[in-house]
A protein has these predicted regions:
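Charged helix-capping and loop-helix junction motifs
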Residues: 44-52, 81, 119-125, 158-163
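Beta-strand-turn-beta hairpins that frame and shape the catalytic cleft
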Residues: 1-4, 96-103, 171-177
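Binuclear metal-dependent phosphoesterase catalytic core
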Residues: 157-205
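Active-site environment of divalent metal-dependent phosphoester hydrolases
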Residues: 10-15, 39-42, 65-71, 109-111, ...
């Protein structure tokens, strides 16, 4: 199966639809948005964004913008927030797991602080912490806004920047963290489970 991956579109409906169309055209059978599909400062776009995600069957996880917006809506409404938009935000998981693959906005888990902490801060300390606390073979994440690959080999962790259009092999005997980059910067990717390769994709405006 080919997985189309995107993150951090931040309320841009046009680039979101462009990414969906391009990833589908290149054979992605499952699409996953790794959070921050909305912009907490532009809540008026949220209903349309949710409509695009649902119409195109895109799975999503909660990002820090969705978390912040959910709290803002709840505080302003003063009720249970039972409209479709609020219900969708409340239903978003902090992470999703598919076999040995986890999808999250940043640090997986149920602690909202993990939505705000970047895995990529220019070094490997955060990735080392994450590898030590988790067991998944692959983690696909966003939030850091730059396509980066962390590999764990023989207890050594390497950080590699992923260039646009680059294809990287992810061996079954290694663990890896893949930051897909920000869709608002034209970055997305496809993971091919059959060949164990991840390819960075450029989404033009």
């Amino acid at each position: 199966q080919r997985l189309g991956l995107m993150a951090d579109s931040h309320g841009d409906l046009h680039i979101l639809q462009r990414a969906i169309d391009l990833l589908r055209a290149q054979g992605a059978e499952l699409l996953v948005h790794l959070g921050d599909f909305c912009d907490s400062l532009r809540p008026e776009t949220l209903a349309d964004i949710i409509g695009i995600l649902q119409t195109n069957g895109v799975l999503a996880v909660r990002g820090n913008n969705e978390y912040a917006l959910e709290r803002t809506i709840a505080a302003g409404r003063g009720d249970k927030g039972d409209n479709p938009t609020s219900l969708f935000l409340r239903s978003l998981p902090f992470h999703r797991t598919m076999g040995d693959i986890t999808f999250a906005h940043s640090f997986p888990g149920d602690d909202p602080r993990g939505l705000y902490e970047p895995i990529d801060a220019g070094g490997t300390n955060e990735a080392a912490t994450l590898f030590g606390k988790t067991t998944q073979r692959l983690l696909f994440a966003g939030h850091s806004h730059r396509p980066v690959l962390f590999r764990r080999r023989h207890n050594q962790i390497a950080r590699e920047e992923i260039r646009p259009g680059e294809s990287v092999h992810l061996p079954r005997n290694e663990r890896a963290i893949i930051i897909v980059g920000a869709l608002e910067n034209g970055e997305a990717g496809i993971y091919d489970q059959k060949s164990d390769t991840y390819e960075s994709k450029r989404i033009s405006p």
